[in-house]
Amino acid sequence: KNLFYILMPVLLFLLTNWMIWSQREPVKGEVIYHVCQRSFFDSNGDLNGDLNGLREKLPYLQELGVTSILLFPLYESDCYHNYFANDFEQIDSEFGTMQDYIDLVNEVHRRGMKIYLDMETQYVTSQHVWWKDAVGNLESKYSDFILFEDESHQTPATMVFDLRLLNGFDGKVIYATTVNLKSKNVLDYNIALFSYFMDPNKDGKFNDGVDGFRLDHAMDHLDGKPTLTNLFAEFWKPLITSLRQLNPAVKIVAEQANWSDYGFEYFEKADIDRMFGFGLQQAILSFNKTEIIRNAEVILGQTPAGKEQIVFIENHDMDRFASVEKDLQRQKLAASLLFYMGGVPSIYYGQEIGMKGKVYSFGNTDGNDIGRREAFDWYTSGEGKGMSHWYKDSGAWWTNANQKANDGISLEEQENDPNSLFQFYKQTIHMRAQHHALSSGNYLNVENSNDHVLSF
């Protein structure tokens, strides 16, 4: 099968060309590993991936070349993905304890790595104290913490996508609502919450705290709610400013709710550090030279000084790249673009071994996304110590699972195969780390007349 492209990166190492490279100094060679900890490695045999399991596998991530880890939300939730909180202040017991979290963070830092935490504090479930205490109680100290549709506070507002409830894969019905981000009390609470995860023991040192946060579904005007406008200036920027006062080195990454948005307004109005290069992701998957260049010149070329774009191929809300593009050589080609074009590359766990998965259509349930979030495949057989089959025997997403024995898509099958996708990822990441031009340079297109050659 002919490749649509031959990748031809032009590596400019001569001293006379250093002027084109960025004067900014991000973490040299930073490579983020975006991991659903529930699906990664189970340390205690309950089929749930957990914090101790992730800590056990840090040597694997370092061997791959990963320098930073981005976790899914940690807090207590009825949702398997933990995006809608029952309690922001409690870690999901299936992940472990607060001490397990601190042990993980300390070990990450001991190894010279960084750790980021996904935070979605814009919604809460009916199990949250704000809901429980405020609904029907105008005297509640939480009366302005969530939005209501009526003056008597009997009906909480809808949440994202104008939903009132979610049907869990395990049969749970989960009610949720939107947090009132215009409340000064809510802003103060968020400052305290984020600050706690940055410095749990409040000693002014950050070895036991996260290095930054991912802000899920961030918007200036949240979900079209009439009262939740101008949030960049009134909520996000004050929050971020307060966090930087605590630790100037903290990194704030925002996921733009509109994936066609380049994110420049987030940089300007909310002072976000990093955005996701969705446009470049779509262009890479298209293997369309014109689209790749157009998006790279905007996303990588026009991002303001001091700000960065995260470059990626897949994430937890998308079909796995290996299910979209089944050709191994094209998978490797996309990886080359991911690591060599610029920005901060991010790998979604299992991407490095070509894990497959698409969204299901099994009715109104959050189980439809499980195909995109299956257990990391450590073994040829698909079974063994640490396999995180938390969705086992729970429904059609188990009987239709992508994971198969002896399919070539496991670490065990690929780690000693010099031609495997895993080995290509490993070699490409280490190549990037060895050259400042690749790890810290700015993207610059080098024009050529061949429609099948991309040079930069």
Give the positions of each predicted feature:
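Loop/helix patches that line or flank the sugar-binding groove of alpha-linked glycan CAZymes
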Residues: 27, 306-315, 320, 324-456
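Bacterial Sec-dependent signal peptides at the C-terminal "C-region" and cleavage site
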Residues: 14-26
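Bacterial N-terminal signal peptides
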Residues: 7-14
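Active-site-proximal helices and loops of the catalytic beta/alpha 8
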Residues: 105-109, 113, 123, 128-139, ...
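N-terminal Sec-pathway targeting helices
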Residues: 1-7
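Substrate-binding/active-site clefts of carbohydrate-active enzymes
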Residues: 24-49, 56-67, 74-207, 245, ...
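Conserved, mostly hydrophobic/aromatic
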Residues: 35, 61, 71, 88, ...
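Alpha-helical packing segments of well-folded alpha/beta enzyme cores
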Residues: 57, 100-104, 186-201, 217, ...
